């Protein structure tokens, strides 16, 4: 037991020494004046960081939060000076002292070869730690501030990925596909055929790493179910005969860039590119999952709506029917859901009413849907256009939304208006959706 205690103590001291070594290197890096020596020191500092385990990384992030923040006394003095004399010089001083030193530390990390990728990976670990320690949010704010500038869409390159792309890149598409799993090379090949398009954003300093990619199907009408779009045996259509582009999957490849606005710019640039390549395209829409619907439905069936919100009587009636006839199935696994298909189908109208309520934010404090996919597209300026019953028969679709999917429509001339409405708390939706709530 004594030996075990000594081993534990030694491991703890070694762990502390690694963090201390990294912090000392960070302080030295911040004080370094030379560019060449600074790049070398940045590389060495990032190498120290790479040696840390998960617990040590958390300790390092906490030190960044506590010891690499602005000096409150200097900030107050500079703010007072600026308030008394609001000159450009005093403003510059205030701006300088108010910036957390860790921001400059991150800039200096970026001098090292591969520094940008290292910072993106570092933020991925920070986001993991942030789930358990809200104090780290101030550190994340600095990461997010810098990454938002470094990954500004003006710096990004839009690339069409086709079957002739390097195998390593194609493997990354398979690995990072987040919406509809790519089931091998044949599946990927079909998604890159002549009537399909895949576009990705790349950053100049990470040329081998896709940041985000979107998959598009060129078809002759707005798609109502995902199965035909993913059918590997379906014959490719002539894209020149198609009038509709369906965005059916968008996937982030870099978890460390979560919350950095990339997807909205990607879709808009792809729309522009497709319009140039295929002038006959008249409609740009999505076929989107509703990932939060089943959880929302279970929660409302168990607890109901908050009394302070006005809920349409149709929604109350639909919820009562679903709770009475399907309550025991709402929490069931996929196998049981398939067995109960007839019971679920008998409540089609009620479930469509409820998904309309969910997607338009009925009963939500801000009047907007809590569904992440809905918020993304609606904030991006799309219109909530059509609900599709039985659109996703795959396990994931049944588990998340009882097979329901949605079409969001991007009308280039209406995008800004729709976005402004969403920001004001209004969801722009078709009568197919709103008509179910009255």
Describe the role of every protein-language-model region:
Residues 1-260, 264-438:
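Extended, composition-driven regions rather than compact fold-specific motifs
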